[in-house]
Amino acid sequence: MYKRQGFGAAWAAWVVDLQVEPASGRIRVNRIVVAQDTGMMVNPDGVRHQIHGNVIQSLSRALLERVDFNAQGVASREWGAYPIIGFADLPEIDVLLMDRQDEPPMGAGESASVPGAAAIANALFDATGCRFREPPFTPQRIRQALAWRGVHTVDDTEIQIS
């Protein structure tokens, strides 16, 4: 197996276009663009589909998913109530693949998910002026950060994205 020194997997970069409703803390992700360098691609459509899946899963993790704990351990034990993103909340996803057939294949795998949370956090900073360093970036956390900055928010306990 060929492996270049210092390069163990494919490279990916995200650009996120989102809006934040300051009063509610609600986030609407409009578009995500992902560029990926996987080296030689045997099946470019398969790589594109893999990246779409990575984006959807990463978006759900960054905005909604969490495991709650109490003194006894894990408190989130009911899968039916576990928050995940729905199809209606998915943004437009554009995938840009680098055509580098002269390079060895580096795989697609989960590499497109690596920059996801950071890209979303940076888009939130651009939209709100507040830094968010701990996902999930829930409406409650958005409202708390905005209130700390003196922005008027409503006090809802939970607001769904979209």
Segments from the language model and where they lie:
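C-terminal catalytic domains of large/alpha subunits in multi-subunit enzymes
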Residues: 3-162
